[in-house]
């Protein structure tokens, strides 16, 4: 449809700004997918304005006369906006005339630059008629690519592509996505529907959605029959419960008994078996021979099968398992009418290995051979555990093996030269990973008499380096630990892992097979026999009486022979058969032991003395910080009736003060005065161990606060102290008294008190040790001439080593820390440094009051004198000998 040239359009101010903004930056183009409109030629309507400058810039629209061209070009494949490499030279020139070049129709022959030049048109025409090669075209196209990120690239519009939210044009944002553009590149209308073929192609592509799994019942039974059986399942109300023991032989017999009257059995799985329903699915199909037609949560519907009543049920089951999946699918297509006959192939998702037993036939041959060989080996080891809830092969029932074997001995082991006996971390990890995948070899329930199991494990280790033992239900963890220790002693293996379900043992690097072990034992027995014979010959030779001759020997004796040994013994050797000589040696040993014990006791006593002195110093440092207030001379008194009422009211009070480890400090007294502002009583809860300590705290509170102590009662939270403020109570100007410690210093004082309590306990311990040392010294004096073996052994056990002494000496330096003033501006300091000379004098004067100083000094002097007498006794004994 042609437009009349006499029609004019005068843009408004907004239109002017819009045109000016696009005029200097890029070439504006109106595109409709594959059709284009150039803004260069003046064929149709001319736009003009009143302004002379704008009148010179005319926009002319050219439209093809054929109205069906745009509809024919709708499905034409458009060129996608591929990533553009940077352009070598970019034309950013600004022209006064805003025109666009015409786009030549074709697949790849399009002009991308808004400024159409004559040379470019000539090149495009030459390429169209075949006068130019493809290489030249690629070189020109490479030169004319727009730089990525430039102004032209941002506002560049290509046919068939829509901008994304960020202003760019990507392959993913083509006309709203792949629902408009097909896989072959055709552009479709939004209202058009996809064909069935396109849907299948899209479904065949990979998606993140989990694929459906087909069970054995879905592949073997027709859909109508499967629907009927499921409806029958929903109408069946009774359920059979499978407990934590799993699918035992009793459960299998019960299921088969129910199949005689009904073709469907509903099961409810309980206990640990319900944690893995997929595995329970496989176990039920394998042990019963049925088919699981429905499963939801822990509920399973088990179908007995089409050929259940036939006598050759096992053969049919085996035949069904050996049927390949392709044949099953073909039979299913023939029986069902819902499948389209035109489709030759049915695309099913890939069946996983753990869904059906059909996949087990596709496993590699080495795994099957291992299972068969293991099954034969387990048959030789003992009877099977028929109630095993897991897969085949069934483990050996270790409870049926003999408990005690007469003359049982652990297997003989020899570690090869240069091999480390223990396992490295990587080796142990690899063996544990291997043990996870193998089935258990034994099932054990008892905890004693495991010699039969140990023998079977040794036989198993000849073929396999691991022995995996499953623990039956009901065995406690402590019992399994005892089982593991007993088996480790009986077999000599290495325990890799132990949990509530399995025990895994490694045979060890020093394990030997039965034949090799027997040969080595025989060889060792032969060597021992030869050694015994040689030793007997030496004893016979040494028992002969040899009299040393004074005449020089003319014969030379060869070195290293028995004759040389006898010669040397006769000349310089000591005869141990002499009783006097043995008594002398024993007496010397006793004297040395006596010296060592006295020296050890002396060190102990000296250390105890130092400990007592340091304990007294610590007590003195703590007492320096204590400056309690004195009791009032004329305290205000209350009557018994008032005391009874105040006690009753105070115990009913909900508000209370909690006195912690800091004890009585300025903050405690301040809180008491704050309580007395609104009430006459204050209740203080103290968590103390003894009543005497609570009484001291109560008296201190009464003295510091100026109140009247009403009562001290035992409550559930500790002890309750109730203090009455008095009739003539006046609030003091300073709520925090200056004579008490601050919160920080009170904490330091509590630490010192705790240390003092420990030191007092240590003092009492040292006092008891001192008494014990005195008694031991007195007893040692009685046995000086003749040693008492029982006494020496007792003292050696009491003072075995000097490690304890070194540890205690290291603890001597643990003095109270220094508590200095912080940044809160508190006054005073608590320092734990050295005592002054006056304090040392006070301690020396107070030493007699403690009752330890004089006794310890006298005791040390006695020990010193006794230790000096020991060398003299030793000399006398040597002269006597």
Swiss-Prot record:
Keyword ATP-binding set for record: no
Compartment(s): Plastid, Chloroplast; Mitochondrion
GO annotation, biological process: Group II intron splicing; mRNA processing; seed development
Residues annotated as domain CRM: 219-315, 421-518, 636-736
Annotated Gene Ontology cellular component terms: chloroplast; mitochondrion; ribonucleoprotein complex
GO MF entry, a single one: mRNA binding
Disruption-associated phenotype: Albino seeds that fail to germinate or yield very slow-growing seedlings and stunted plants. The seeds of the double mutant plants cfm3a-4 and cfm3b-2 fail to germinate.
Comp. bias (Acidic residues): 802-829, 836-847
Region called Disordered, residue ranges: 799-856
InterPro entries registered for this protein in UniProt: CRS1/CFM2/CFM3 (IPR045278), RNA-binding_CRM (IPR001890), YhbY-like_sf (IPR035920)
Annotated transit peptide: 1-50
Coiled-coil blocks: 588-617, 752-786
Keywords noted in UniProt: Chloroplast, Coiled coil, Mitochondrion, mRNA processing, mRNA splicing, Plastid, Repeat, Ribonucleoprotein, RNA-binding, Transit peptide
Keyword Ribonucleoprotein: yes
Assembly with partners or alone: Interacts with RNA. Part of large ribonucleo-protein particles that contain CAF1 and/or CAF2, and RNC1.
Function, as annotated: Binds specific group II introns in chloroplasts and facilitates their splicing. Acts on subgroup IIB introns. The substrates of the subgroup IIB also require the CRM domain proteins CAF1 or CAF2, with a simultaneous binding of CFM3A and CAF1 or CAF2. Required for seed development. May influence the biogenesis of the mitochondrial small ribosomal subunit.
Protein name: CRM-domain containing factor CFM3A, chloroplastic/mitochondrial
Organism: Arabidopsis thaliana
Gene name as annotated: CFM3A
């Amino acid at each position: 449809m042609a437009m009349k040239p006499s029609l004019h359009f005068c843009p408004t101010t907004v239109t002017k700004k819009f045109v000016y903004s696009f005029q200097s930056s890029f070439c504006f183009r109106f595109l409709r997918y594959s059709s284009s409109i150039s803004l260069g030629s003046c064929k149709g309507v001319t736009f003009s304005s009143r302004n002379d400058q704008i009148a010179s810039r005319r926009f002319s629209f050219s439209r093809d006369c054929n109205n069906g061209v745009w509809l024919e070009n709708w499905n034409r494949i458009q060129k996608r906006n591929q990533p553009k490499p940077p352009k070598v030279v970019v034309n950013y020139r600004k022209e006064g005339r805003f025109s666009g070049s015409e786009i030549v129709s074709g697949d790849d022959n399009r002009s991308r630059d808004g400024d159409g030049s004559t040379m470019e048109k000539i090149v495009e025409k030459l390429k169209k008629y075949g006068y130019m090669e493809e290489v030249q075209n690629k070189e020109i196209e490479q030169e004319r690519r727009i730089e990525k990120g430039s102004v032209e690239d941002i506002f560049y519009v290509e046919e068939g592509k829509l901008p994304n939210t960020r202003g760019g044009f990507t392959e993913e944002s083509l006309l709203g996505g792949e629902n408009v553009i097909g896989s072959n590149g055709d552009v479709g209308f939004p209202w058009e529907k996809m064909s069935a073929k396109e849907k299948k192609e899209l479904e065949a592509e990979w998606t993140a959605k989990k694929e459906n799994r087909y069970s054995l019942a879905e592949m073997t039974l027709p859909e109508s029959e499967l629907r009927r059986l499921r409806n029958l399942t929903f109408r069946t109300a009774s359920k059979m419960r499978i407990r934590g023991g799993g699918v035992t032989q009793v459960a299998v017999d019960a299921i088969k008994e129910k199949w005689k009257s009904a073709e469907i059995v509903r099961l409810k799985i309980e206990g640990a078996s319900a944690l893995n329903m997929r595995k329970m699915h496989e176990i039920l199909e394998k042990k019963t021979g049925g088919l699981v037609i429905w499963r939801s949560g822990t509920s399973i519907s088990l179908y007995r099968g089409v050929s259940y009543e036939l006598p050759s049920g096992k053969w049919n089951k085996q035949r069904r398992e050996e049927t390949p999946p392709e044949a099953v699918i073909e039979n299913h297509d023939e029986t069902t009418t819902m499948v389209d006959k035109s489709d030759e192939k049915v695309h099913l998702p890939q069946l996983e290995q753990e869904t059906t037993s059909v996949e087990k036939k596709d496993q590699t041959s080495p795994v099957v051979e291992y299972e068969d060989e293991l099954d034969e080996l387990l048959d030789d080891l003992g009877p099977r555990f028929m109630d095993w809830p897991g897969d085949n092969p069934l483990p050996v029932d270790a409870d049926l093996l003999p408990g005690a074997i007469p003359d049982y001995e652990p297997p003989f082991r020899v570690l090869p030269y240069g091999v480390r006996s223990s396992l490295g971390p990587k080796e142990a990890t690899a063996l544990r990973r291997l043990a996870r995948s193998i089935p258990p070899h034994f099932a054990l329930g008892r905890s004693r008499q495991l010699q039969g199991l140990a023998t079977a494990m040794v036989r198993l280790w000849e073929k396999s380096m691991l022995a995996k033992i499953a623990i039956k239900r009901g065995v406690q963890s402590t019992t399994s630990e005892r089982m593991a220790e007993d088996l480790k002693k009986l077999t000599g293996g290495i325990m890799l892992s132990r949990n509530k379900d399995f025990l895994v043992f490694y045979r060890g690097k020093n394990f030997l097979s039965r034949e090799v072990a027997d040969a080595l034992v025989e060889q060792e027995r032969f060597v021992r026999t030869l050694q015994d014979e040689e030793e007997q010959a030496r004893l016979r030779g040494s028992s002969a009486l040899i009299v040393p001759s004074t005449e020089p020997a003319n014969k030379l004796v060869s070195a290293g022979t028995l004759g040389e040994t006898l010669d040397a013994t006769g000349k310089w050797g000591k005869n141990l058969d002499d009783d006097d000589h043995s008594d002398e040696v024993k007496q010397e040993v006793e004297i040395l032991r006596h010296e060592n014990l006295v020296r050890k006791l002396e060190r102990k006593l000296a250390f105890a003395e130092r400990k007592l002195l340091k304990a007294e110093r610590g007590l003195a440092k703590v007492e320096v910080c204590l400056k309690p207030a004195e009791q009032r001379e004329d305290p205000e008194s209350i009557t018994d009736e008032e005391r009874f009422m105040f006690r009753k009211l105070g115990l009913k009070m909900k508000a209370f003060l909690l006195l912690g480890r800091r004890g009585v400090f300025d903050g405690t007294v301040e809180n008491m005065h704050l309580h007395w502002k609104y009430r006459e009583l204050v209740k203080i809860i103290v968590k103390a161990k003894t009543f005497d300590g609570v009484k001291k705290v109560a008296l201190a509170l009464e003295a510091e606060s100026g109140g009247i102590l009403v009562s001290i009662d035992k409550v559930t939270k500790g002890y309750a102290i109730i203090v009455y403020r008095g009739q003539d109570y006046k609030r003091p100007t300073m709520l925090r008294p200056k004579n008490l410690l601050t919160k920080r210093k009170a904490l330091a004082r509590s630490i010192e008190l705790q240390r003092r309590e420990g030191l007092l306990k240590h003092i009492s311990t040292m006092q008891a040790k001192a008494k014990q040392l005195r008694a031991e010294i007195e007893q040692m004096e009685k046995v000086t001439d003749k040693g008492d073996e029982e006494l020496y052994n007792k003292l050696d056990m009491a003072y075995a080593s000097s490690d304890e002494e070194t540890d205690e000496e290291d603890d001597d330096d643990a003095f109270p820390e220094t508590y200095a003033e912080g940044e809160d501006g508190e006054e005073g300091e608590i320092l734990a440094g050295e005592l002054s000379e006056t304090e040392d004098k006070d301690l020396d004067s107070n030493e007699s009051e403690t009752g330890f100083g004089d006794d310890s000094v006298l005791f040390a002097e006695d020990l010193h004198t006794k230790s000096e007498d020991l060398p003299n006794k030793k000399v006398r004994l040597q002269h006597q000998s």
